[in-house]
């Protein structure tokens, strides 16, 4: 059912909301290749409750992330970028299948996304001037 991937775990078919899980409703929807109308995946049909749970999970994780030194945050983001680059082919295939676009464009989108993660990884250590944390509301 899934596109030919070297790492099938790149398409987990669940939401990452603190942990990998199904939509609260239990509903799913099929993802098909618009070029062939072939179903290649099934994913959670997430709703407002899932969005709220994601916001709550992010809010709960914030104090821990906030305490991580900038150099360590940069290393985490760099590692994420390295993983994106390492799996560019599989991620490009997923984008190509989901959107019905040429594989070269899917690969290009992954490279473009990677450039943003790389930029933020580098910016994490470039805090110039005074850094005043915003209050969490």
Predicted regions and their residues:
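Glycine-rich loop-to-alpha-helix module at the N-terminal edge of alpha/beta enzyme cores
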Residues: 40-127
